[in-house]
């Protein structure tokens, strides 16, 4: 009986299995009954395979195999051949899997090496570089200029997140990519941003005309003449008039003079005029001969400890957040006018007490004095406690000569010549300029929190005292920066749970270089009547007139809930950042700077007398009829009649103003 050769099935299996191994050649010998335990030996590597080939039996030897008559031996040989066939297939599959995995790993490593050498890296700004990432390599051109090398150095060594100067780069890292920006825009179209309002609008300021220019000049001459006149008491002493009739006339003149002084003071306080932005854009860009260099500085506010954050919310208002939002609005503003700009950023971050923060930020800014002085437009954006910090910091920088406002008078090899002065704008959002709500330090919640963070929280209430060290430094800072033509935009939140409107809008200081606005979130559900009141009052204040203290009286009743978010939603509104830019670039400058006017008041008396609010409303309506159209008062009456307050505080306001029903 002739035994069937066992090499046919293993050979066909080897042929089909080894086709996937391009770099490996496997040869299998014939398995005879005399060598049942023989196996092929292989050695593998990730670069290929080396076979130790067994000598193949010649066909001549194959033909010499003889048949055996024993059927039991045939069965044993067949079973042994089947087992060898299965073992070979299993071995080949394992070897194939290992080879394919090795080749894949090799390709991945090669691709990573190529990518490392060729692909430029752009590190994310918010988190920095991952420690697991390989160091980037770049081909630095030998003929590159200084600007190219500087930008390349910035890409190789990205600047830290905070307390450093982030220079301009064409692919600005703070701007969101197109995908994220588009998603944000869609969210705005259906979300809470567009319905939000900021009152009063910038358009409340009068537009500059020939008539109001001449009128302002006449009033200026009249004021100068009035100031040169000797006082009535001096004239009386010179004339030595002593009888009672002259004394009575003197008293009458005193009352008349006080009324005239108030009228003259209101006109002197006045307001700036709206002008075309191209007037200042041309000056900043040397008549469009170069890009405008813009520097944005962000200063965050008070950060509570983690224990208290579940009650008042997480502190999302970081300096980086403000700088990012402001940069986007600045780009949009200048893109509308098709003006090239170069934006640099400094995000100042440090927690602690106010004076410690001012000193620390001063050292940071002093280190970048050259870059700061090469800027044409400097935009400070601040929030909460960061507002007084920003004003004190800017005043210190100007006093000590770190910021030079006029590069046409002082310039050198490092500081470039500029034909115009710098324009500096300060945006103060929900600033604690006059402290938190009066009496909040006596609440159980705040008293319990003072045990955790005593000094940082206690000094916020020091701003409620006009004779405190913090308030005096703040007032001195205001005087310094306004005398150097810095323009300040105070914006308060209607339902702020921490800062009242009279504090966030800084009502104790008056000057044409100050613009006040109130942010009204759609989620606050502010009644139309309250919105109308703050709009009229804000318009009067921005035009240099008197609101008769109505904002001070109603501020206490507008406090939001502790978790309402009014204090932390203001810095998400684009209109707020846009307002700070427009007030700086689209208004006139005073021909002659005069000091800021301070009007201190007692916070303990605000809202204490229920009869004061109707009197304030009477004065507000009088001023509105005098300076605005009658439509505002008509709408005020209509909205008051339709108003149905829900909270106890708002019901109290309506009860005290019931005289409006009878047009009293």
Curated annotation (Swiss-Prot):
Regions of compositional bias (Low complexity) in chain numbering: 1-23
Biased composition (Basic and acidic residues): 57-67, 95-110, 231-241, 248-262
Chain residue ranges for the region called Disordered: 1-146, 231-262
Signal sequence interval, chain numbering: none
Matches recorded under InterPro entries: AB_hydrolase_fold
Disulfide bonds: none
Annotated Polar residues bias: 68-94
Misc: Present with 377 molecules/cell in log phase SD medium.
UniProt cross-references to PANTHER family, sorted A to Z: AER328WP, CHROMOSOME 8, WHOLE GENOME SHOTGUN SEQUENCE
Name of this protein: Uncharacterized protein YML020W
Organism this protein belongs to: Saccharomyces cerevisiae (strain ATCC 204508 / S288c)
């Amino acid at each position: 009986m002739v035994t069937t050769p066992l090499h046919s099935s293993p050979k066909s299996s080897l042929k089909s299995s080894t086709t996937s191994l391009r770099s490996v050649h496997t040869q299998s010998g014939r398995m005879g009954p005399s060598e049942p335990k023989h196996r092929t030996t292989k050695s593998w590597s990730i670069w290929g395979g080396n076979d130790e080939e067994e000598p193949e039996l010649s066909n001549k030897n194959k033909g010499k195999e003889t048949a055996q008559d024993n059927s039991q031996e045939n069965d044993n040989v067949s079973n042994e051949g089947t087992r060898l066939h299965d073992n070979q297939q299993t071995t080949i599959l394992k070897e194939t899997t290992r080879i394919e995995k090795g080749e894949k790993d090799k390709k991945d490593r090669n691709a990573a090496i190529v990518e490392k050498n060729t692909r430029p890296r752009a590190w994310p700004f918010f988190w920095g570089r991952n420690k697991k990432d390989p160091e980037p390599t770049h081909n630095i051109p030998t003929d590159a200029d200084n600007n190219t090398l500087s930008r390349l150095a910035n890409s190789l060594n990205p600047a830290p997140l905070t307390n450093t100067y982030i220079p301009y780069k064409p692919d600005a890292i703070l701007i969101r990519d197109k995908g994220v920006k588009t998603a944000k825009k869609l969210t705005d179209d259906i979300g809470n941003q567009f319905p939000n309002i900021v009152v009063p609008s910038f358009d409340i300021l009068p537009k500059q005309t020939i008539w109001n220019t001449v009128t302002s000049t006449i009033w200026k001459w009249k004021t100068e003449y009035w100031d040169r006149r000797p006082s009535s008491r001096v004239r009386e002493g010179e004339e030595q008039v002593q009888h009672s009739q002259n004394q009575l006339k003197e008293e009458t003149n005193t009352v008349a003079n006080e009324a005239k002084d108030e009228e003259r003071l209101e006109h002197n306080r006045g307001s700036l005029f709206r002008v075309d932005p191209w007037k200042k854009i041309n000056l900043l860009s040397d008549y469009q001969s170069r890009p405008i260099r813009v520097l944005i500085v962000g200063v965050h506010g008070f950060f509570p400890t983690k224990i208290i954050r579940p009650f008042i919310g997480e502190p999302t208002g970081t300096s980086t957040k403000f700088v990012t939002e402001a940069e986007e609005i600045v780009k949009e503003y200048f893109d509308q006018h098709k003006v090239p700009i170069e934006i640099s950023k400094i995000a100042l971050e440090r927690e602690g007490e106010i004076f410690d923060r001012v000193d620390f930020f001063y050292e940071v800014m002093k280190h970048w004095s050259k870059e700061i002085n090469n800027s044409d437009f400097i935009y400070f954006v601040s929030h909460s406690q960061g507002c007084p910090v920003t004003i004190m910091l800017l005043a210190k920088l100007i006093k000590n000569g770190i910021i030079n406002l006029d590069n046409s008078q002082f310039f050198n090899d490092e500081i470039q010549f500029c034909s115009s002065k710098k324009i500096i704008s300060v945006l103060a959002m929900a600033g604690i300029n006059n402290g938190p709500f009066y009496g909040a330090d006596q609440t159980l919640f705040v008293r319990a929190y003072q045990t955790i963070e005593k000094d940082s929280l206690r000094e916020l209430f020091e701003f409620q005292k006009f004779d405190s060290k913090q308030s005096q430094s703040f007032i001195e800072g205001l005087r310094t920066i306004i005398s150097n033509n810095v323009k300040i935009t105070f914006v308060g939140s209607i339902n702020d749970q921490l800062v009242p409107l009279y504090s966030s809008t800084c009502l104790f200081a008056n000057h044409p270089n100050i613009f006040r606005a109130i942010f009204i979130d759609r989620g606050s559900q502010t009644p139309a009547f309250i919105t109308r009141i703050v709009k009229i009052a804000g318009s009067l204040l921005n035009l240099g007139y008197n609101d008769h203290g109505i904002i001070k009286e109603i501020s206490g009743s507008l406090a939001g809930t502790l978790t309402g978010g009014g204090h932390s939603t203001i810095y998400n509104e684009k209109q707020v950042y846009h307002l700070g830019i427009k007030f700086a670039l689209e208004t006139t400058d005073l021909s002659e700077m005069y000091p800021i006017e301070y009007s201190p008041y007692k916070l303990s008396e605000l809202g204490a007398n229920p009869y004061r609010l109707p009197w304030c409303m009477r004065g507000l309506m009088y001023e509105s009829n005098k300076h605005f159209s009658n439509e505002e008062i008509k709408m005020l009456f209509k909205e008051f009649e339709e108003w149905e307050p829900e909270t106890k505080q708002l019901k109290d306001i309506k009860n005290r103003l019931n005289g409006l029903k009878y047009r009293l």
